[in-house]
Design a protein with these regions (language model features):
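Helix-turn-helix
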Residues: 2, 6-40, 44
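Short amphipathic alpha-helical elements of helix-turn-helix/winged-helix folds
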Residues: 2-6, 81, 142
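Short, charged helix-capping/linker segments at alpha-helix termini
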Residues: 13-14, 126-130
Length: 181
């Protein structure tokens, strides 16, 4: 959690292992006993955050009765996670991370895992697995970009996030219902 906060505040390139060690209350050699490099620490952190996001979505849709409810519950879970876990969201989806091939690869792994989950919820008769996967990436992109904008406005829990998530879910649902094979 300490590394998460430091990376969220300063970004990957603005963060040093000295700062992480100091914030954690350990020496740099102790930190290097656990992580071979700043990149290794960051990758492990991104993997853990991706697992948390995926878990939040899966748990969020677990009690949904049908496809439309799954879409809405999924967006609500995503928005709740993004607003509750602001530093984690910033580490995962900071736009500058995409410019670096190493960081982008770690983040693409998270997006792929989430898209795989979302693809399993898309039920369109006659749609191939590849087509379902492409649509899932569209849904993930919609969630990520709208959440980033929402958080960029300084909005969060209690400021209409649930209503906004419902609107984005409606947008996604309407789009998915328009898909025909």
């Amino acid at each position: 959690e300490v590394a998460l906060q430091v990376f969220a505040d300063k970004g990957f390139y603005g963060t040093s292992m000295n700062e992480v060690a100091e914030a954690a209350g350990v020496t740099k050699p102790v930190l290097y006993q656990h992580f071979t490099s700043k990149e290794a620490l960051y990758r492990e952190l991104v993997d853990e955050l991706g697992t948390r996001l995926e878990r939040a979505i899966v748990e969020g849709v677990a009690d949904a009765d049908g496809p439309r409810q799954q879409v809405e519950a999924g967006f609500h879970a995503y928005f709740r996670w993004a607003t509750r876990e602001g530093p984690a969201f910033r580490v995962l989806f900071a736009e500058h991370n995409r410019a670096d091939p190493v960081l982008a690869t770690a983040i693409e792994k998270v997006e792929s895992a989430v898209a795989d989950r979302v693809a399993g919820f898309i039920e369109v008769e006659g749609l191939s697995d590849d087509e379902r996967q492409v649509l899932a990436y569209g849904v993930v992109g919609l969630a990520e970009s709208t959440s980033r904008h929402w958080l960029g406005l300084g909005l969060g829990p209690g400021t209409g996030a649930d209503a906004f998530a419902a609107q984005v879910a409606q947008l996604a649902w309407s789009g998915l219902r328009g898909v025909r094979r």
